[in-house]
Amino acid sequence: MDKSISVMLMYLLTHLGLIFFLYPEDIIGSTDSAHWIPIVIGIIVHFVVISIYMKGLSFYPKWDIIRIYLNAGKAAAIIFLLPVTLYFFIIAILAVRAYSEIICIVFLSNTPLWSIMMLLLFVSTYLAAKGIEAIFRTGVLLAIIFLPLISMISFTSFQNINWYYSFPLFEQDFSFLTKPSYFKSFFAFAGGFLFLGFIQPVITYQRKKILLAALFLIPFFIFSVYIPILTFGEATAVTLHFPFVVVVETINISWFMFDRVTMFFLLTLITFSMLFISITLWQANRIISKCLPIIKPFYLLLAISVVIFVSCLMIPDWNSVGNLFLWNTPLRFFVLVSVPLSIYFLGLRFKRKVGHELN
């Protein structure tokens, strides 16, 4: 049964949870003008990557990427699945630690950080244990409830902007390509597309609808960066942590029954982030379960969650989180580039092999 709508919504929600928190600060910090250029480059890379990835997956209609790599040989499985698993661990650790820090700063300043991390990880682990269909059903429900709210807040955040701050529109050079913060910004692209290769054949979808979902994300990539700049100016926006969240704090909606729009905005994004963490845990568990079939997947998932929680406890402060995002850059680009390309070329080889056998 085609479930393209569910996959589209999951693709949107997992990316939105990454875009509004971390992406604006990295892009604003990478250049002092013409921010649309690094944004557009990232979006182009995003579309190229998911197009190649889904084209490669289309050669294997009933296979997930674990089976694809295992079919290619033990060496291919180790070369690609081992870094992917490590990447899942790292992004889960960073997501749990970063989002818990945000919750602690904005809502629960007197609550111990470890308890927030435990709660966030518990909910995500519970969802992952229920399986991919439960995660997707939860995603559809959250999309129905929260996507209109996110859209409303995004558009009402234009109320305090000054278009003068958008100039200059052109950059004399491309120095942002050498800035670590720009490479960190690809976290918003690299973590959210891999699940498309794990859900086959349980959940089927149409490629063009996923591209449509990616197209729908483009305004949010732009808004998340430009609204803080147009509100505060580049010189001020570059000094802010979570600049879009700060902008939301300035929004005044007279007909809204609650005083703090920020609270609902952040709670919405936190629910999206829990979906992202849960699907990341589920993917990591799928790979490890395939390698260790003698251990029940549920116990493996618990072990993964414990490792992630202990790792989060070992991160002392927010600066260390930023350093981990930076140190993770080579692995991030390895996954972003090598997985789609390898799936595509393995798919071409598989197609030729099947064609020869039929002839």
PLM region spans:
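Hydrophobic alpha-helical segments and their helix-loop junctions in multi-pass secondary transporters
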Residues: F89-V96, A128, I145-E171, F186, ...
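Membrane helical hairpin/interfacial module
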Residues: L16-L113, F122, F334, S338-L341
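Membrane-interface loop-to-helix entry segments
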Residues: Y99, W114, L127-S157, N328-P340
